Amino acid sequence: MGTYVERLWQPEDAGGLSRKDRAPGRYLAYIPEPLERQLPQLGADALSAAEDALVVLARADEIVGSRSGFLNHLLIRSESISSSWIEGNRVTPKKLAIAETLRQGSQAALDVVANVRATEQAIAGLSDRAHAITVGDLCELQHVIEPRLKTGLRVEQNWVGGTGWSPLRADFVPPPEDLVPSLMENLAEFVTETAGNPVVRAAIAHAQFETIHPFIDGNGRTGRALIHTVLRRADAVRHTLIPISTVFAGNVNAYISGLNAYRAELSMLDEWIIAFAQATEKAAANAVELAQRVAELDITLLSEFIASRKEAGVVPSRPRKGAVTVKILETLAAEPVLTAESVCARFEVSPAAAHRALTELTDAGVLSRTKDPRGKLLCWTADRYLDLVALTERSNRVGGGDTQGQKVRGGPPAPERK
């Protein structure tokens, strides 16, 4: 699938490096072969796995259907939390949602907000098949994730993993910087022009991107966002986001092994395609399960709200259609964090009406108040919807199923920036 080139490691600025990392030496950088316009020939098992995954994607897309507008809010955040988890960045759904709504929070939370924006851009901005994907598009996608870095492809050698800060001890060394532009042009053309099974195309595009590792940072999150671009452009899914990172985060070692198999030799490509297809199926199942849980929670919260009004002697106990409380309930899955100001703007009501509705929903146990360390009210949160995001993104890390009360598997340590 590629070749190696020998390079010399001789750091110009060795300040702060350990003695081992300061030591010069030679290392091998991997150069992947450019992608062909036609998909490679696969074995029967890989073809079958990809076809099965495509059927499952279509079924999940159909099941979620008209609810995708609300569900995608939760699915994108589940995907972004898990994609960041793989890179060692841990944020709870509630902290993410609050940071996104208030535009403030820890740097970790703001980083995941950036991941959310990149995933949204990968779907909305790059899914039009009439638009030819360019290297500039991919650079912009990465810049949304890592706005603190200069936009553009890397102009120096980078590496992945290892026990120190040196390519001599790295787990994997991507191609030299001077080859990155042509390899990325080739990848952009592949994403735009190649036909065939979308699952196979997404698997190859993602693995090739991760192999090129075209940026100094943000490669993993950008590469996983690219998966959604490929699937959406190919109409493999039209409505639903498939949270594939929730599966990758469940077994990071298997995910990395799959990428290594892709790089090893052509005969091992099938191994990666099968693993990717299986991850896609499991992610589709996660999306369907979330849809079912949200539908159940919608009914539960409305019932609890009606019961609360009845107990308080409010007549009628069922709020009228069009009431602010009903409008809030109908959109909570898509807007699980609220402020009085956001309710005023969203539903065009007065501050007094917004406060009354939020207070009534809080008294019924539908919403919770969130305060800062000094006791100042920050916002209202629909914690049970946010808990569903946690269940979705955690389920694979504890082996699937209902994860409430279970301990998650440890993720990777936060990576050093190279």
Could you tell me what each predicted segment is?
Residues 1-418:
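FIC/Doc superfamily catalytic core
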